[in-house]
Amino acid sequence: MSGSKSPKGEFAGRKIVLKRKESRWHHYKYVNKALKLKEKSDPLGGAPMGRGIVVEKVGLEAKQPNSAIRKCVKVQLIKNGRVVTAFAPGNHAINFIDEHDEVVIEGIGGPSGQAKGDIPGVRFRVVMVGKNSMRELVRGRQEKVRR
């Protein structure tokens, strides 16, 4: 006689709850959430944005079938010293960013916090340069302060 593995009966509640708790650990999303692996591996440490200093400007080739050089910057984060690559969005946006500038970066919005579109391995984008919004600089509504 084949029966189900789940206990049945009037007093089976505790056993069912314990079994469910145990089974959760076989699901990778639950494990990542329970052990806070996202915060541990994320360069921003779970924060929505982070400040950093521009180390160098780089041009990355787009993935096939596109053909372009995507303008990016390498940024050293202030909070933990990690170096990440961030995309500079907008026409001629790279011209507003100089080495040793302080920038604010955020996630680029790819699937599961990963790279987006045809830019390989880039998970962040530049939001602000100094105190100026990147979007406003590109549109010409703000000028970058020269020291």
Curated annotation (Swiss-Prot):
Q: Which GO terms describe its cellular component?
A: small ribosomal subunit
What are its GO biological-process terms?
translation
Q: Which PROSITE patterns match?
A: RIBOSOMAL_S12 (PS00055)
Q: Would the keyword RNA-binding be found if you checked this record's keyword annotation?
A: yes
Task: Output the InterPro entries linked to this UniProt entry.
Answer: NA-bd_OB-fold, Ribosomal_uS12, Ribosomal_uS12_arc, Ribosomal_uS12_euk/arc
What's the stated role of this polypeptide?
With S4 and S5 plays an important role in translational accuracy. Located at the interface of the 30S and 50S subunits.
Indicate the quaternary assembly: Part of the 30S ribosomal subunit.
Q: Which family does it belong to?
A: Belongs to the universal ribosomal protein uS12 family.
The protein, known as = Small ribosomal subunit protein uS12
Instruction: Name the lineage.
Output: Archaea, Methanobacteriati, Methanobacteriota, Methanomada group, Methanococci
